UniProtKB/Swiss-Prot annotation:
Additional detail: Presence of 2'-O-methyl or 3'poly-U in the small RNA deters the activity of SDN1.
UniProt domain Exonuclease: residue ranges: 140-291
Subcellular location(s) per record: Nucleus
Keyword DNA-binding: no
Domain of life of the native organism: Eukaryota
The keyword ATP-binding belongs to this UniProt entry's keyword annotation: no
Lineage, opening ranks: Eukaryota, Viridiplantae, Streptophyta, Embryophyta, Tracheophyta
GO biological-process terms attached to the record: miRNA catabolic process
Family indicated by similarity: Belongs to the REXO1/REXO3 family.
Protein name in UniProt: Small RNA degrading nuclease 1
Signal peptide span: none
Cross-referenced Pfam families: RNase_T (PF00929)
Stored CDD domains: REX1_like, RRM_SF
Stored InterPro entries: Exonuclease_RNaseT/DNA_pol3, Nucleotide-bd_a/b_plait_sf, RBD_domain_sf, REX1-like_exo, REXO1/3/4-like, RNaseH-like_sf, RNaseH_sf
Amino acid sequence: MELKLATAEKQVLDELVKLLQSRDLRGENGNWKEFLHVYDKNADSPSDPSRRSHEDLVQFLTTFKKKEDLQLLKCHANHLLIENLKQESQDEDTPEQMLVRLTVEHPSYSLDYSFKPYSEDWFVSDVGMKMKKVMESTNMVAVDCEMVLCEDGTEGLVRVGVVDRDLKVILDEFVKPNKPVVDYRTDITGITAEDIENASLSVVDIQETLQPFLSTGTILVGHSLNRDLEVLKIDHPKVIDTALVFKYPNTRKLRRPSLNNLCKSILGYEVRKTGVPHDCVHDASAAMKLALAVVEKRVDTTIKPSKEMLEVEKAKLFLHKIPNNVPSEELEQVLSGKFTLDVKQAKTQGRYYCAFALFHSSEDADQAFEHIDGIEMTDSLGLPQKVVIIKLSSGSRASIYVRKMVQDE
């Protein structure tokens, strides 16, 4: 870590020492004042970190050896990197940096990317401690993951795809979950128990493969990328999230266009047909193509939904606040009629997940909503929704919310 600290900006080192001071954390030579007492015998020397030399600060910081302390320092340096980016003028932004800026300035960014990566199995990028040249790198790789539901209600990584700027596949591997799996979500992921039976790679192996890219300041690209980073257990500040970059006009900022709708609007094709399982390499490539459409072709990040897209939205119902212990197969009982379920992995390893019910037409979706035996209400944005109680095959009960995607006319 000393070599990496030696390349850090003086201002970053000042803030890191102040952080350690505020938490009264101790390295091998004690806290900051105790360190100075040993390191510098001159009683008149200043203790304010901003008045100490670059070398003094590095000497103190290198006395911290515990992994959790190092994780804390790197996280704080990365946070400073993002805050500095927000304060800097946009005039000199490269197109890639502009997309990073659009991501980190989105109202949902701070919540979606507020990881707590202090456990042993997390990898925290050290790019915030690098020289400005490295931090300004415009190299990009796109990432997408497939996840399953584990016995303890968390998400388990089972496949990861990574492509570079030229859409060359860097990584396409199955990963062995380290917990028992209760739902492979095969209809969504296309993955079965047999697919990962012989998988030998772990999350740590994937982290080690990506580490050279992260340490050189490469930008990670993805759609709802926070979900992928959460399951990869990677904290990296330089991200382009196409779910946050692109937006619909005259709609609430928190409404995010789907990857499929973005591809239809900007690239002119669907990333997948309805009912076809996900493919992480295809999804990673789609996210990279969307980023490149802005970088190379200056495509507008505000997209206008077509009549076809609006009709597609009307033909959906949104099932949300689904407890993680409810298998996706049990959701079939909630709605009547013919539909396909598109299950979405949880944004974080929390208590709930969500799904879309895709109907043949808006009329079918409206009829299914009317037939739901539940309490009707509206959400905070005035969209009609119902809360329904279902009985699971296990004998227990669960409450689920079902919401329309568009206001009633």
